[in-house]
């Protein structure tokens, strides 16, 4: 990994506890009455103590029966972290491609894409039958490796050199993505992520990050 080079590039954000202030799976678990059990597994997964794929399947299984319509409660309004809209708008105005690569769920990611006008989103799809969660995930699980692969694929699609890519995340599932990017940003992150990041960004307000990245362009 190297510091960001000149001109606009591609920035990939994690979703839960990065673009938004909540862990969606924990809040769905609250609707299902099992938040404490799910939150403990989420915390262990974000520290990197347990396998992400296995932990996700176990947690999602506990969500079986939750009505799809209740998910909307979690996004009324969307719980953005401070400065998110300003950060992304500033980068977009400077010509950047902005994407979301998440081990969370498409139900939420697609709503963020619409709200923020993101260029692409990649996330896990919850299986829903008869208006309720089944407790299963459809298709492949978006884990750390998939995030890194998607970052590279999107950079190639838009003909953006890896040196002009940035990845922003907070947990162990973001590690490979940060390592794959030209610049890895650990946002209010777990210690394991801080150890490998190029930038440790410890303030909640993300608006200053856009300025920092754009300034790096001007100086390069």
Tell me the role of every PLM-derived stretch.
Residues 75-98, 103-220:
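C-terminal cap/substrate-recognition subdomain and adjoining C-terminal extension
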Residues 2-126:
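Alpha-helical substrate-recognition element adjacent to the catalytic core
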């Amino acid at each position: 990994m190297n510091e960001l080079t000149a001109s606009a590039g591609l920035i990939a954000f994690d979703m839960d506890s990065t673009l938004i202030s909540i862990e969606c799976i924990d809040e769905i678990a609250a609707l299902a009455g099992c938040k404490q059990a799910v939150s403990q597994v989420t915390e262990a997964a974000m520290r990197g103590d347990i396998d992400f794929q296995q932990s996700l399947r176990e947690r999602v299984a506990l969500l079986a029966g939750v009505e799809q319509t209740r998910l909307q409660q979690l996004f009324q309004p969307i719980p953005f972290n401070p400065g998110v809209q300003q950060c992304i708008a500033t980068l977009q105005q400077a010509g950047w491609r902005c994407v979301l690569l998440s081990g969370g769920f498409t139900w939420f990611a697609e709503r963020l894409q619409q709200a923020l006008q993101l260029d692409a989103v990649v996330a896990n799809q919850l299986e829903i039958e008869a208006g309720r969660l089944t407790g299963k995930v459809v298709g492949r699980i978006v884990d750390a490796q998939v995030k890194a692969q998607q970052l590279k694929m999107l950079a190639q699609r838009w003909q953006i050199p890896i040196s002009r890519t940035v990845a922003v995340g907070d947990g162990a599932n973001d590690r490979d993505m940060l390592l794959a990017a030209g610049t890895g940003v650990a946002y209010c992150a777990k210690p394991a992520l801080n150890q490998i990041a190029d930038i440790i960004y410890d303030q909640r307000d993300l608006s200053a990050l856009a300025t920092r990245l754009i300034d790096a362009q001007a100086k390069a």
